[in-house]
Amino acid sequence: MEPLQKPFGTVLENFLNYLLIERNFSPNTRDSYRNDLQRYLQAMQEGCGSLEAINPDSINRFLDELHKTGLEASSIARNVSAIRSLHRFLINDRVLESNPAENLHQPKLPKYLPSVLTLDETMRILQAPAQKVPPEKLYLRDQAILELLYATGMRVSELVNLKQQNLYLQEQFIRVFGKGSKERLVPVGSSAINSLTLYRQKLRIQLAGAQSEDCLFLNARGKKMSRMAVFTIVKEYAMLAGIPKTVSPHTFRHTFATHLLEGGADLRAVQEMLGHSSIVATQIYTHIDRSFVKEVHRSFHPRG
């Protein structure tokens, strides 16, 4: 892909800086916007020649081309959202006087239910690190990661960015910084606390050595772990536990929410623990186990 020329390149960088500084978006979210908008602005640069020449037809032609590449509906929707946000920014920044993306509609997305682990599958994965033969040096760290993912439902990006000072283990809370640096306190149970304590006392000190790295979870070189490293760990122990389904850190997030709701937890409390800004995002977990919902209705409705 050829580099963007002025003013297209300038507009993109200004918008990305706006997302990072004024909207407080995470670097990962900003990079996602960069990838989508780089492709969009490249097409507009080649097809329109100027920002002022962009019109609804040129945007729709671009989206049609995305459809032809076989891009999933969710990815198309993400592109539409990015394009709309960019053009609103250009209006507010007085770069353009009219908004060609004003009437751009999001494509309808197929509803899906997230994959979750049964309680038995969850326990098998959580027990897998200690059952490795021979046991590996890093199993205490891996055990703590798995326990924490299930205990808190936090996102993988939140986990790798945890600092030592974010732990309040005596109070059984962890301070988590989510999307847009939104802060929340998440309860953590005794099993995860025990695993975290063992990791910090017996392994983390060795991994850190003389380095001053403050991130909670470190790799074998004493540096902050990457998101992909956590994905690899989760996948490895799921395979070791004989789980046939695809398991990722986000599977633990889905499982955390589902098991809480199946246990009778309040939907608003689960929303707060997950860090969802809208209750709608949390409600999907009420649809996962239809038999459970029916049982709740039978148990609590006066005429159930």
What are these model-predicted stretches?
Residues 1-304:
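Conserved catalytic core of the tyrosine transesterase superfamily
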